[in-house]
Amino acid sequence: LSEWALVYENYDPGQERLREALCTLGNGYFATRGAAPEAVAGEVHYPGTYLAGGYNRLRSEIAGQEVENEDLVNLPNWLPLTFRIDGGDWFDLEQVQILDYHQSLDLHRAVLERSVRFADAEQRISRLSQRRLVHMGMPHLAALATTLVAENWSGSVEFRSALDGRVVNDGVARYRGLGNRHLEPLRVEEHDSETLFLKMRTTQSRREIALAARSRLYLNGEHQELQPECERKPDYIAHHFRLDMTEGDTLRLEKCVSLYSSRDRAITECGTDALNTLHRAGTFEELLASHSEHWLQLWRRFDIGIGENNGEQGERHALILRLHILHMLQTSSP
């Protein structure tokens, strides 16, 4: 038990939606639920990204009556990142043997971390480590670092990094009879061999949402300049990166995302600003350092201590209190 980390040492599908809510990261401009990057919306997972003030209305017919509902729109999912080995199935935590699992929300830095050691059906053992942030000082930026270690195998690895606009508002069972598709596609584009672009628009409030994503791969610390295959649909775009790994290799993929809205102040055009901000963004470690510094300053002002020497119960109370403070700060964006 730590006063500064919300820790899970096992994977429990029945608890995933609760954990995703508790592990939400945000900065007052937008927030992203703590769903795994490979997660697909369903009974177990519900990926969600939400913009402050990002509402939209839909009309539905219920029992012969027209009903109008207003929702905070689930925005395009910037997280999608998965992989497969030797052309097999895409990574699915429920289809592998989990040898070790650790997930931690670092409250001090507002960083979500996950480490999974697993064996697949071919008994290939791998270690997957991920860190994620939604930048407190640069409100339009988020980043995800993924590391894959081949422990006892060699082979071809394919990574798929995507922006997904096929999302709906479907997180609350009792509202599933209402209209839930709040977004319509405007444009998808492969900007270069590392950068993808997606623009959507809310159907009634007519707010445009632009996302730009940059994916960079490093094999054993060396930047890999690859020519990925691009997969695109009207509301979805992905890069497929393929390269070979040998036993003991470490492959790292850094995904940085910029998100803008047409209602943002002092911008030229949301798509242009999304791309410009992304191009100026540093590496994951650089973003992590500046993000952590902002949180250090916040905790100096807002931390509340519970007397020392209170044992495990005192640590638990301190953890709960700091978790609430973290979410308050992520919402208010001081």
Kindly give the residue locations of the regions a language model identified:
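Acidic/polar, glycine-enriched structural segments that form the non-catalytic walls/loops
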Residues: 1-334
